[in-house]
Amino acid sequence: MKISVSKNDLENALRYLQAFLDKKDASSIASHIHLEVIKEKLFLKASDSDIGLKSYIFTQSSDKEGVGTINGKKFLDIISCLKDSNIILETKDDSLAIKQNKSSFKLPMFDADEFPEFPVIDPKVSIEVNAPFLVDAFKKIAPVIEQTSHKRELAGILMQFDQKHQTLSVVGTDTKRLSYTQLEKISIHSTEEDISCILPKRALLEILKLFYENFSFKSDGMLAVIENEMHTFFTKLIDGNYPDYQKILPKEYISSFTLGKEEFKESIKLCSSLSSTIKLTLEKNNALFESLDSEHSETAKTSVEIEKGLDIEKAFHLGVNAKFFLEALNALGTTQFVLRCNEPSSPFLIQESLDEKQSHLNAKISTLMMPITL
């Protein structure tokens, strides 16, 4: 193998691949990136037993095709230090030489045949994603998921495919809150009418870096493969049964309040400077915010005027986690939001105002949250 490649193109590709390397054991083949030159393309692969990525860049010139491997971390360390001009990569015996002008490096290779093959699946479900709504849903629900949850099933995001109605439900929870959305008019091809899979949060975070729109998603129930023109990504799925979240959602709410999103965000941020929990009081023409701190005498208070007034006879009090409330508001694509409540001790719902239009490219997220006991 002997090629010339753009320094910037190679460095960008290597940065994407770092998350897929085994950096603890340099003797493992999983610490290496697999390189293969085919015609005018350099294909790069990195994988451990759970997750993997294959990408390619165009070569500037290709004198000889071939394969090789190289320690992924050291490869990036070298390339990032070089100047912004073409780089020569050449395999010699059991080493890979890296050259640019008067600088040269040589790193040992492993046997490329020992590199694990990328999986080929027989999909039970597949979709073509031509707009950013799915990635938008992933991005907004990701903060709710605990990667280290003691319940394995909850350490990922649920994707629930309904072929009959052509809908995809996306759900995440940490048991204290639950965020969900239903994406409609999805072209689902499935061997079963209803099928679901749980993507690990680690995979979810990498998907957000690699994909936006114009990609395919396929799953055989054990693995998921996501692919676009530049990248092929695979991940093992979480094996388990996700809780039936529909049973958790209240059938109805006693009260429903339409409120200003930005005013609430500013007020919560002010009070959360002293405490992570806040007492929210809703009155006919005001929303009052007060920090809750049982250990110190520190307090923070602020209020927001509600111009249109609320249909409420007496003050309604609610204890909320400031961080959770802010993340729920940040997931909304409208300037107003709806707060749906029952008793102060019961879960409450935050969702977008149905009267306000938003971009059809955005996912409409609803978040059910447990209150803080006052």
UniProtKB/Swiss-Prot annotation:
Record key words, sorted: Cytoplasm, DNA replication, DNA-binding, DNA-directed DNA polymerase, Nucleotidyltransferase, Transferase
Domain of life where this protein originates: Bacteria
Classification via InterPro entries: DNA_clamp_sf (IPR046938), DNA_polIII_beta (IPR001001), DNA_polIII_beta_C (IPR022635), DNA_polIII_beta_cen (IPR022637), DNA_polIII_beta_N (IPR022634)
Localization terms from the record: Cytoplasm
GO terms for biological process, alphabetical: DNA strand elongation involved in DNA replication
Entries under Gene3D superfamilies matching the protein: DNA Polymerase III, subunit A, domain 2
Disulfide bridge partners, by residue number: none
Listed GO MF terms: 3'-5' exonuclease activity; DNA binding; DNA-directed DNA polymerase activity; identical protein binding
Principal place of residence: cytoplasm
Family indicated by similarity: Belongs to the beta sliding clamp family.
Chain's role: Confers DNA tethering and processivity to DNA polymerases and other proteins. Acts as a clamp, forming a ring around DNA (a reaction catalyzed by the clamp-loading complex) which diffuses in an ATP-independent manner freely and bidirectionally along dsDNA. Initially characterized for its ability to contact the catalytic subunit of DNA polymerase III (Pol III), a complex, multichain enzyme responsible for most of the replicative synthesis in bacteria; Pol III exhibits 3'-5' exonuclease proofreading activity.
Protein name listed in UniProt: Beta sliding clamp
Lineage: Bacteria, Pseudomonadati, Campylobacterota, Epsilonproteobacteria, Campylobacterales
